[in-house]
Swiss-Prot record:
Pfam families from the UniProt entry: RRF
Protein purpose: Responsible for the release of ribosomes from messenger RNA at the termination of protein biosynthesis. May increase the efficiency of translation by recycling ribosomes from one round of translation to another.
Gene3D superfamilies (UniProt xref): 3.30.1360.40, Ribosome-recycling factor
Protein name, per record: Ribosome-recycling factor
One annotated GO molecular function: ribosomal large subunit binding
Protein family according to the UniProt entry: Belongs to the RRF family.
GO biological process entries: translational termination
Primary location: cytoplasm
Keywords: Cytoplasm, Protein biosynthesis
GO cellular component, one term: cytoplasm
Family annotation (NCBIfam families): frr (TIGR00496)
Species of provenance: Borrelia turicatae (strain 91E135)
Length: 184
């Protein structure tokens, strides 16, 4: 029974970490350099995260400065930002890109919350898939007479209880992100 708990905890922890990582790329009221983690730049034929080919700094509350390590990448970085879903318009001075970030409108904040909700739902499905996988494994062990029917019932109940707990954590992470997005 402990093996199921350990396996469930391991897989669900990965689900939660992945959710938090994906939420970092959503734009909120606060500017964060992790916004650019998912922006991919064509770097010698390879799609490379922007943060690996340039220094991203935030010198002021509403200003982002992107300084590429290789000046020849400036136009490619600019194109990558323009084609991303960040809705940002960089301006170049030949050495660095500057992005003046406008305050998010209420409508845009609501769109981002919808996007965050959709992401949370996808991760709840992933959590349920982990539950289903472990349930199948336990049922197979019972079918092969490796565990008793009572053990199976106990294992399935434990898996369900723990899955509910992890789904609640996903909801808590979503609620925190919603609060952060709607904060002015």
């Amino acid at each position: 029974m402990e093996e199921y708990k350990a396996l469930l905890d391991e897989k669900m922890s990965k689900v939660l970490l992945s959710l938090e990582s994906e939420y970092k790329s959503l734009r909120t009221g606060r500017i964060n350099s992790s916004l650019f983690d998912k922006v991919l730049v064509d770097y010698y034929g390879e799609k490379t995260p922007l943060t690996r080919v340039a220094n991203v700094s935030i010198p002021e509350a509403r200003l982002i400065v992107i300084q590429p390590w290789d000046k020849s990448l400036l136009s490619k970085i600019e194109q990558a930002i323009l084609s991303s879903d960040l809705s940002m318009n960089p301006s170049s001075d030949g050495a660095v890109l500057r992005i003046k970030v406008p305050v998010l409108t209420v409508e845009r904040r609501k769109e981002i919350v919808k996007q965050a909700k959709k992401i949370a739902e996808e991760y709840k499905v992933a959590a349920r898939n982990v539950r289903q996988e472990l349930n199948s494994k336990a049922k197979k062990q019972e079918k092969d007479s490796q565990i008793t029917e009572d053990d199976l019932r106990r294992i399935l109940d434990d898996i369900q209880r723990d899955t509910n707990s992890y789904i609640k954590k996903i909801d808590e992470i979503f609620d925190l992100k919603t609060k952060e997005i709607m904060e002015v």
